[in-house]
UniProtKB/Swiss-Prot annotation:
This is 2-dehydro-3-deoxyphosphooctonate aldolase. Gene3D superfamilies: Aldolase class I. InterPro entries: Aldolase_TIM, DAHP1/KDSA, KDO8P_synthase. Pathway: Carbohydrate biosynthesis; 3-deoxy-D-manno-octulosonate biosynthesis; 3-deoxy-D-manno-octulosonate from D-ribulose 5-phosphate: step 2/3; Bacterial outer membrane biogenesis; lipopolysaccharide biosynthesis. One of its GO terms (biological process) is keto-3-deoxy-D-manno-octulosonic acid biosynthetic process. Its EC number is 2.5.1.55.
Amino acid sequence: MDQKMINLATEAGAIEIANDKPFVLFGGMNVLESRDLAMSIAEHYVEVTQKLGIPYVFKASFDKANRSSVNSYRGPGMEEGLKIFEEIKRTFNVPLITDVHEVHQCAPVAEVVDIIQLPAFLARQTDLVVAMAKTGAIINVKKPQFLAPHEMRHIVTKFNEAGNDKIILCERGSSFGYNNLVVDMLGMDDMKKTGYPVIFDATHALQRPGGRADSAGGRRAQATELARSGMALGIAGLFIEAHPDPDNAKCDGPCALPLHQLENYLKQMKAVDDLVKSFAPIDTSK
């Protein structure tokens, strides 16, 4: 199937998002903890990606609405979060991605960010899908942990019928028994057969959901190995979250990449991506 390309317009020029183009980094922090920390993390990502020549989109959440515990930190909320996003975009001239959880959030969020993310737990919520589609924004669809990769076509169809075909599909692992996720690499390749760009969330694929009783655990020590495996498939992008002090991050610290490791980590990912995309395709079905 022909591979679709998404053009993300920025003041610095268009970013091409496609499975056969150089990979795009969707990176930042899990949740906005403070304005100063968000600015510092964004600055570091921008410096590293510019140095390495990697197209970049800043990611953070203004509200983590699906935390394990009612007492867990959720974020600053939409109003304050959008102010921080506006400042990041203005200061660093970088495109933005964030997630929405409710229909009423879609329009105001689309006025500020460039890509709206549909959370994995909500990916089959038709009213939310339609509201997101109607913004006309680029949509990043997280694959639910409970859904087979080939079933993503049904979510794509919902967006298409609501008038939006600017879709990115994101793999973030599949449930494997209790408190565990695994990544089906062949399933990710099946998602590519929809024709839409596929990105790999190598951070959340490291989760152990509910593994710490009232929050998710993770396998940060295996962040490099898992990401290299995903990049070897020849995909459109990589989704990662980093933190200067992962052990004290307010959400998903056990999965977060230490921020000081970002440059070395991305050097390896770029090397894998460049190598894989230099190969001529081989049709082994014949």
